[in-house]
Amino acid sequence: MPTTPATATHSSSNGTAEAIMLELVDENGTTIGTAEKLAAHQAPGQLHRAFSVFLFDEQGRLLLQRRALGKYHSPGVWSNTCCGHPYPGEAPFAAAARRTHEELGLSPSLLAEAGTVRYNHPDPASGLVEQEFNHLFVGLAQTAPKPDPEEVGETAFVTAAELAERHAKAPFSAWFMTVLDAARPAIRELTGPSAGW
């Protein structure tokens, strides 16, 4: 498996590698512990904190990303602008902004909280399980993305109608429709009724 910022271990100050840890949470989103990232996703999965970002351009089009083929989880599928996991103790908002910049070279404008959603989505292709308490964020992409090729294979801005067409033909992440549907009220508020979200 290729090493990417999302799968790599971190080097500590003494030069030893540290596994990436995630926050485990209860059904209310209260932190109850930590787990190593891959272990948290192995069946049956452990409920952990995550985030999903939806960025739109000035025409109200959603920025999608196709996950890089080297990703250990859901490689090569389309998904929302950015998703990931805060480090233990890191605020979801800060993690969302950080990872959006790391993956896409974007600093979102007007990034706002859009609620939370809890789900359990097994990924048949990998055998991994997304047991997540997901913090949702919406905002604007006011500059062109500059994707990190180790994280993102491709990007596309799509209207609601174009998304429906693409979703019918191309593979998407198991969690995509769940997080999109949960974020729709905030998306409509951001983009206005004419955007069709």
Curated annotation (Swiss-Prot):
- What is its pathway? Isoprenoid biosynthesis; dimethylallyl diphosphate biosynthesis; dimethylallyl diphosphate from isopentenyl diphosphate: step 1/1
Ligand binding (Mn(2+)): 41, 48, 85, 130, 132
Q: Which family does it belong to?
A: Belongs to the IPP isomerase type 1 family.
> Which Enzyme Commission number(s) are listed?
5.3.3.2
Q: GO MF annotations for this entry? A: isopentenyl-diphosphate delta-isomerase activity; metal ion binding
Q: Which SUPFAM superfamilies does this one have? A: Nudix
Please give the function described in this protein's UniProt entry: Catalyzes the 1,3-allylic rearrangement of the homoallylic substrate isopentenyl (IPP) to its highly electrophilic allylic isomer, dimethylallyl diphosphate (DMAPP).
**How does the cofactor bind to this protein, according to its record?**
Binds 1 Mg(2+) ion per subunit. The magnesium ion binds only when substrate is bound.
Localization per Swiss-Prot or TrEMBL: Cytoplasm
The Swiss-Prot or TrEMBL record lists the needed cofactor(s) as:
Mg(2+); Mn(2+)
Keywords attached to this Swiss-Prot or TrEMBL record, sorted alphabetically, are: Cytoplasm, Isomerase, Isoprene biosynthesis, Magnesium, Manganese, Metal-binding
Q: Does the keyword Iron apply?
A: no
User: What reaction does this catalyse?
Assistant: isopentenyl diphosphate = dimethylallyl diphosphate
Q: What is this protein called?
A: Isopentenyl-diphosphate Delta-isomerase
Q: Look up and give the organism this protein is from.
A: Streptomyces griseus subsp. griseus (strain JCM 4626 / CBS 651.72 / NBRC 13350 / KCC S-0626 / ISP 5235)
What residues does Mg(2+) bind to? 103
Annotated Gene Ontology cellular components are: cytoplasm
| Occurrences of domain Nudix hydrolase (ranges) | 46-183
Name the predominant localization.
Answer: cytoplasm
Q: Which InterPro entries match?
A: Idi_bact, IsopentenylPP_isomerase_typ1, NUDIX_hydrolase-like_dom_sf, NUDIX_hydrolase_dom
Name of the gene encoding the protein in the UniProt record: idi
The UniProt entry, under Gene3D superfamilies, shows: Nucleoside Triphosphate Pyrophosphohydrolase (3.90.79.10)
